[in-house]
A protein has these predicted regions:
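Long, charged, low-complexity, helical-prone intrinsically disordered regions
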Residues: 1-137
Length: 137
């Protein structure tokens, strides 16, 4: 919980306060508390997002293998704590993105971790447009 700025006591109190809204699940020997608004089961097909550096999806967990195979750790973050912007596709980190200057403006450049990764170009374009809209471009 260190990344949240909360103490362990405060985090436990928060879980207690909204406990009736949480579902407890056991997975791979760990207890997970899920809020109904954050559930993704059945809804991540085709879902793509450009996540910023230091996003809590990677920063918030010691074991990141559920969303990122360990062989790609060095592409998402360094040993000394530098995190890179990543592409989340269908619940998995599949690549990096960065802001590149183009003749017709700014747009993110993408690099997938595995050549065989297939992402529908229309989905990738939509994610890029959402990013540009967020920047006000």
């Amino acid at each position: 919980v260190w990344w949240s700025g909360l103490s362990v006591t405060e985090a436990k109190q928060g879980i207690y306060l909204i406990g009736s809204e949480l579902t407890e699940e056991q997975w791979k020997g760990q207890t997970w508390y899920l809020h109904e608004s954050g559930r993704t089961r059945g809804s991540i097909k085709g879902h793509i997002r450009f996540l910023p550096p230091y996003d809590e999806l990677l920063l918030g967990y010691k074991d990141r293998t559920d969303v990122l195979p360990s062989e790609h750790y060095s592409k998402a973050f360094t040993r000394n704590g530098l995190f890179f912007p990543v592409i989340l596709y269908e619940g998995q980190i599949v690549g990096n993105w960065d802001r590149k200057v183009k003749r017709n403006g700014c747009g993110p450049g993408c690099s997938l971790f595995r050549q065989e990764s297939r992402i529908d170009e229309a989905l990738l374009d939509k994610a890029q447009q959402q990013y540009m809209q967020f920047l006000g471009k």
